[in-house]
Amino acid sequence: MSGKLVIGNWKMNTRGDSARQLAAALLADGQTNREGVGIAAPAVYLAALAEQLKGGKIALSSQDVSRFAADGAFTGEVSAAMLADVGCRYALVGHSERRQYFREDNAALLAKMRNAIAAGVTPVLCVGETLAQREAGDYLNVVREQLAILSDIADGEYVVAYEPVWAIGTGKVASLEQIAEIHAFIKNWCLQNAGGSAKIRVLYGGSVKAENAEAILATENVDGALVGGASLDADSFRVICQAAGKMI
């Protein structure tokens, strides 16, 4: 495991044509078409993008994975085995938007983590506090509770992404001091408590843009970035990936 990891989370954006055009632009650029770069696309476009990305180096990620492992009567779900079958290398788990809108709890997220690992897909566990929790000084406890499921992972590789909820899509960015503090906390907690991977990557997410990426990625214990809106613009995403590439 070397170099920074940058994953672009497209969220519920793009259509078929625009997804293909964006992927084509990323494939055509050496800064984005390389190891250590991934895109988390909407589920309906994963199969088409997997075909398009063949021969390139960009990793494909899903934005979620089912908590149900076996095939069966789970309408609307996409299993980890299906994601692996289509070519996904990563799967986001527990993004704050899913925690908020779908009330995902630790039990469901642990099942998702285990299913992804069993299928050979690397889960990216998203953690982070709200503004109220930050201002109340409770943010470390919140993140600790979200990380707790890693104690029940017996084996396998995974990634952690710290995304302060108050910085997602708001234009607000945590200070470099805040980022350094929480990333050190996450790594120390994982070293003492987490199972599975002995060396865990911790990404930062939350209004990562072309203009702030280099400073964020240079911060101690930041192993990469989970990029939202900026990943929908090929030029902006290129600058972020270029900044990450300098730090290999």
Curated annotation (Swiss-Prot):
Involved pathway(s): Carbohydrate biosynthesis; gluconeogenesis; Carbohydrate degradation; glycolysis; D-glyceraldehyde 3-phosphate from glycerone phosphate: step 1/1
CDD domains associated with the record: TIM
PROSITE patterns per UniProt: TIM_1, TIM_2
Keyword Cytoplasm recorded: yes
Reactions mediated catalytically: D-glyceraldehyde 3-phosphate = dihydroxyacetone phosphate
Subcellular location: Cytoplasm
InterPro entries recorded: Aldolase_TIM, TIM_sf, TrioseP_Isoase_bac/euk, Triosephosphate_isomerase, Triosephosphate_isomerase_AS
Gene3D superfamilies (alphabetical): Aldolase class I (3.20.20.70)
Keywords linked to the UniProt accession: Cytoplasm, Gluconeogenesis, Glycolysis, Isomerase
Protein name per UniProt: Triosephosphate isomerase
Organism of derivation: Chromobacterium violaceum (strain ATCC 12472 / DSM 30191 / JCM 1249 / CCUG 213 / NBRC 12614 / NCIMB 9131 / NCTC 9757 / MK)
Lineage of origin: Bacteria, Pseudomonadati, Pseudomonadota, Betaproteobacteria, Neisseriales
